[in-house]
Amino acid sequence: MYERRPIAQLPDLLISQIAAGEVIERPASVLKEILENAIDAGARAIEIRLEGGGIRRIAVSDDGFGIPPEELPLAVAQHATSKIRSLSELESVASMGFRGEALASIASVARLTIISRVRNGDHAWQIDASSGEISPASGPPGTTVDVRQLFDNVPARRKFLRSEATEFGHCLDALERIALANPQIAFRLFHHDKAQRQWLPADPGQRIRDVLGAEFAGQALPVDTRYGAIGLMGMVTRPTAARARADRQYLYVNGRYVRDRTVSHALRSAYADVLHGDRQPAYVLYLEVDPAAVDVNVHPAKHEVRFRDSGAVHRFVSQVVGQALAQTGGAQALDAEDPPPEPIRPETPPPPSLSPAAALPSAPAQPPAAPYPSRPHSQMPFRLQEPAGVSARDWQSLYRPLAEPGATPQTADRPQAAAPARLVSEEEHPLGMALGQLHGVYILAQNARGLVLVDMHAAHERVVYEQLKHALDERSLPRQDLLVPVVFHAQEKDVALAEEYAEQLSELGFEMRPSGPTSIAVRSVPALLARGDIEGLARAVLRDLGAVGASQLLTEQRNELLSTMACHGSVRANRRLTIEEMNALLRQMEATERADQCNHGRPTWIQWTVNDLDKLFLRGQ
C-alpha cells in the first residue's frame, strides 16, 4: 500500500535527466544534437573526434558564428535557444533545433565543456557545464563542444550501451545521415585520433556517391520534380538493386532526417509491381514543403513529422518516384558507365559494293531444327488476328501485339530467317538485334555493348501488363452497383473516414456510406474487383485512409488482377519465335515502361559486355 506523498517541484537536474531519457539514448544521439547545433550556427567545416565509440569522448568543432561569452551560461540552461521567439516561429521553424534542451540534457548525463569564439572576438571563452564557470581559452572562431564519460553518473543507462564498435557504428550512421542532408559542409571524422571519414563540400549527387559509394550511385535514378510549394529531389535505386534490408533508406523533410509512414507508404506504392518478394528499395530523397505545412514538434528526438495534407504529399511522392522508375526497357544499357567496346574489325574489310543482303547467310527453306527437345507442333502466328469491327482501344486486344500495329503477322510457311530489307545497327536499339532462341525460353540478342539475354515470357508479360494498365487508365474505371449492399459493423472513426473521403472513393468506383452510427454500407465497387472480399477490401481501404490519408489499395488490387491476366496472355516457354518476332518483342520492351522487370519484380533481361565475355575466356590476360 503506497502512502500519499505531497506534490513537489522537481529539481532542475532531475528535469534535465528526464528530458535526456527522451532525447539521449546513446552516443549517436549526443552526436546528432551537437551536429545539428553546428549546422544551425552556419558552419561550413565540422570535425568530429570520438573515443571509445563516443562513450568516453565526443568532441565536435565547427567554424560557425560562435557564442558570445555572456550567452554561454544560457547555452547550457534549460529551454534557452536562439532559434525561436514565438508560436508563429515554432509553427514554421526551419532550423534543426528549436527546443533549447539538448545541451542541458547532455550536461545532466555527462561532463560537458564548451569553447567558443565569435568571428570578431579577440579570443575564445570556455564554460564548464557542471560548475557554470567561464574562463578565457584559446581557439579559432567557431565552437567546440566536448562531451566526456557519457552516463557515468547514470549507471542504469550506461549498462544498456553496447560495445565500442557497435556504438561507433551508430555514430557513423548518424554522421552519414547529416552529411547527406548538408553536402555544402565539409566533415572529418576521427576515432582514437585515426581518420575514418572525410567528405569535402560537393553537390548533392557527388555527396551521395561519396557517402554511399559508387555502387549505390551507379544503380540510382535521379529524381528532381517541383510543383508549386512542394518538391522532391534525390536518387532512388533501380528495382534490380533492391536490398534484403531497409538499411539504405534516407528521407529528409526540409533538410531534416525523418521516418515518416506517409512517405514510406507512398514509396512502397511506387515500387509495388517492380520489386521481387520482400526486397527493399534504397533511396536518398529530399522532400521540400512549406515549413508552415509540416509540424516537426511531434517527437522528442524530432524523428517524425506530421503533414497538414498528408494525402497530397502521398500522391506527389508516389507519382514522382513512379515516373522515375518508369524508364523503358533497355534504358540501363544506355545509362551504363563503361563505354561500348570498339567493334572487332577484320584486317581486310569487305568490298564497299557488297550489299547488306549478300552479307547475310542464305535463309533455309524450312526452319532449322530446334536445339531443345520439343513436341511436334505447327507454327502459329505470334500476333493474333484482329477481329473485324473490334476497336483498337478494346483492352482485350492488348493480349496480341508483339509486332507493330500495322505489321503483317508471320505465317507458318514463311522462312524463319528471312533477310530484312536493311541491316539495322544494334547501336540504334538498347536491346540490340535478336540472334536466336535458347531452349524456347530465352532470346539471345547483340547490342553495342555485347550480349543480351532476354526471358521472353517475363518480358512479354510486362509489355501486356503495362498495356492493360494504360488502357484502363485512359478511361473511367467501370463500377458495378451491388443488388444487395454489403453492410458491416465499423468503429465510429471508420464511419467518419467513409464520410470524409466519400468523393475520392467515388472517383475510384467505390461507394460506401454510413448506414448507422457504427455501420457502413458498400453500394458499388470497381467492376474488376466485384468478385472479391468486398468487406475486407473496404476495411483495408479505410485503414489506409486513416493511417496515411490516401489509399492505393484499389489500384493495387486492380493491378494484381491485370497482372494475372497478362501472365496468362503472354507467350509461353517452348514457343518457337521467328527472328522478326523476337525483334518485335525487343522493340516493344524498349517502348514499354518498367520493362526491365516482370510483374513480379524479376529481371527480364541481363547484359554481358564484350569485356565480360573476354574475361570468361581469359582474353587479354
From Swiss-Prot:
Q: What is this protein called?
A: DNA mismatch repair protein MutL
- Residue spans of biased composition, Pro residues class: 341-354, 364-374
Segments of this protein annotated with the region Disordered: 329-381, 403-422
Tell me one Pfam family matched here: DNA_mis_repair
What species does this protein belong to? Answer: Bordetella avium (strain 197N)
What GO terms describe the biological role, i.e. biological process, of this protein?
mismatch repair
Instruction: Kindly list the GO CC terms recorded for this protein.
Output: mismatch repair complex
Which family does this protein fall into? Belongs to the DNA mismatch repair MutL/HexB family.
